[in-house]
């Protein structure tokens, strides 16, 4: 539920490496 400061409209979350996932075109962590 914490925004990772990254969008995932066109590309996947690079921050997925630290546990972030794409939700509603924005990368979130928990």
From Swiss-Prot:
**Record's family?**
Belongs to the cyclotide family. Bracelet subfamily.
Q: Name one GO biological process term.
A: defense response
UniProtKB keywords: Disulfide bond, Knottin, Plant defense
Summary of the function given for this chain in its UniProt record: Probably participates in a plant defense mechanism.
- PROSITE patterns documented for this protein: CYCLOTIDE, CYCLOTIDE_BRACELET
By its UniProt entry, which InterPro entries does this protein fall under? Cyclotide, Cyclotide_bracelet_CS, Cyclotide_sf
Q: How is it modified after translation?
A: This is a cyclic peptide.
Q: Where does tissue-level expression of this protein occur?
A: Expressed in leaves, petals, petioles, and runners but not in roots (at protein level).
Q: Which cysteines are joined by disulfide bonds?
A: 4-20, 8-22, 13-27
- Tell me the domain comment: The presence of a 'disulfide through disulfide knot' structurally defines this protein as a knottin.
The protein's name in its UniProt record: Cycloviolacin-O17
Q: Which Pfam families match?
A: Cyclotide
Give the source's domain of life in one word.
Answer: Eukaryota
Q: Which organism is it from?
A: Viola odorata
**Where's the Cyclopeptide (Gly-Asn) crosslink?**
1-30
């Amino acid at each position: 539920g914490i925004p990772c400061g990254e969008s995932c409209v066109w590309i996947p979350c690079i921050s997925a490496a630290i546990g972030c996932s794409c939700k509603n075109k924005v990368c979130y962590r928990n």
